[in-house]
Amino acid sequence: MKGQETRGFQSEVKQLLHLMIHSLYSNKEIFLRELISNASDAADKLRFRALSNPDLYEGDGELRVRVSFDKDKRTLTIADNGVGMNRDEVIDHLGTIAKSGTKSFLESMGSDQAKDSQLIGQFGVGFYSAFIVADKVTVRTRAAGDKPENGVFWESAGEGEYTVADITKNDRGTEITLHLREGEDEFLDDWRVRSIISKYSDHIALPVEIEKREEKDGETVISWEKINKAQALWTRNKSEIKDDEYNEFYKHIAHDFTDPLTWSHNRVEGKQEYTSLLYIPSQAPWDLWNRDHKHGLKLYVQRVFIMDDAEQFMPNYLRFVRGLIDSNDLPLNVSREILQDSTVTRNLRSALTKRVLQMLEKLAKDDAEKYQTFWKQFGLVLKEGPAEDHANQEAIAKLLRFASTHTDSSAQTVSLEDYVSRMKEGQEKIYYITADSYAAAKNSPHLELLRKKGIEVLLLSDRIDEWMMNYLTEFDGKAFQSVAKADESIEKLADEVDENAKEAEKVLEPFVERVKTLLGDRVKDVRLTHRLTDTPAIVTTDADEMSTQMAKLFAAAGQSVPEVKYIFELNPDHVLVKRTADTKDEAQFKEWVELLLDQALFAERGTLEDPNQFIRRMNQLLVS
């Protein structure tokens, strides 16, 4: 063969092949689904390119995929007449994996085969799944529109190298031949292959045909029998589609191995005409947080495939949604640039966003357990919503889940509707606290009075929470209030201070002034508080001041952070505060005030500028 060369696989391909062969073997029949799915994609791409260049059909516009086998040679062949590939595309698609982050993902894989199977499945194994059942794979392909002599041959045993060469191939498209491993003869059985095609490929619009051989007059006559329905699933009536068909179609378009959590199939007529089929996956893709992660819906216009990953139809906080939209209102020659500035696109995006939020609301209402699965996988992404989508903020807020003092668990199961339903008589605000961890939030001294009064507090410990709460200002007419900020509503919750206590506080006024003088401009103010029960002192910020958690976010992002000026609040009933107020020794007074402030700062920030001084003062207090 001309132009023959042997090349090495990209290292990620070798890792993937090894992991896949071992972890997916128990579900090995999926290789046929993957290869037929690829053939369907190749047909879609040809239809799209032929819109502007009909000559690409080369006189053969009947697109299909054909499956045949040779029992003597122990081979199974999947052939399509789709878009095909040239030599560069073969090397690019069959010798490398173009996803960024692949290497670190594969290196993180463990030895748990069930887990590995799910992870590799969502990764989208596609072509490489052939090696689960084959010890050698041969590919013959030619790109649509190329000359017959520009065909390409590719072959590999999946062990680190592959051979590529030039061949003559008269018909366009791709032909994949699997040389089956010993013990895989079930895939040479006509009934078995038919059943797999029916199971996995009924929803594909492309006809899938199987070879039929009949003896007539001493000769073998070959014909092709269509196995699948070959009608695009989303064009069918919902009442005729089984759940299994919806599940398999999801796996086809998402290249996932697990069933989706839920879906919504809708046909809209009127001002706009479109069909949408939207899925919520049950598992987050491994590269969800990768900047290069491709997301979006498959776009069809009047049943013609236009593009994958059309991100213009979903806001970023719903980037986990998979599915498709088939529009009658967009032009067939639509481009990503046209989509960006299209009124039709904006209207579709608005309608589809509302559809997804309604779907999630229904899931939360009908199946709390499934919704918890969704929340664990995608909750952090949904929390981007209040900042990104003000128009749907109330609907998004209903879908948020939090840990709270009501449940005494770190599980985020409490909805805002749950919280509001439990609000105490006279309570006007929704109280929350943000912290680095659930434990830090739960045990914060800011909660002491609220806990004593039986008032629920939402415990927020995800990094995104502080940023989210800057945009989420109210729910159901109730304002959100951080308990780490100075607020009159919290002070009002304290019991009425009796006359004797008021007199005692008057006595402490000189002490407060003394502390102010000592600390100077290191704090914004010093005051007595009734919001503490067990703790001697805390620091709080004014409502308009940057919070501690927000300052941490800025610092982590490498941005300059303005100095946070805290209000130093002292508990007049605490023995340490009383003892400090009574001391006449100025040096000791200074040490104890500094110690109280350090304690409060440490509880608030989790760090101190000078921890050694804090330790020295603590040691000194312990031995005094």
UniProtKB/Swiss-Prot annotation:
Renumbered residue ranges of the record's region B: 337-552
Protein localization: Cytoplasm
Region described as A: spans on this chain: 1-336
Entry annotated with the keyword Cytoplasm: yes
A Gene Ontology molecular function term of the record: ATP hydrolysis activity
Stored Pfam families: HATPase_c_3, HSP90
Annotated region described as C, given as residue ranges: 553-624
GO cellular component, one term: cytoplasm
Oligomer status and interactors: Homodimer.
Role: Molecular chaperone. Has ATPase activity.
Family: Belongs to the heat shock protein 90 family.
Protein name stated in the entry: Chaperone protein HtpG
Provenance organism: Salmonella choleraesuis (strain SC-B67)
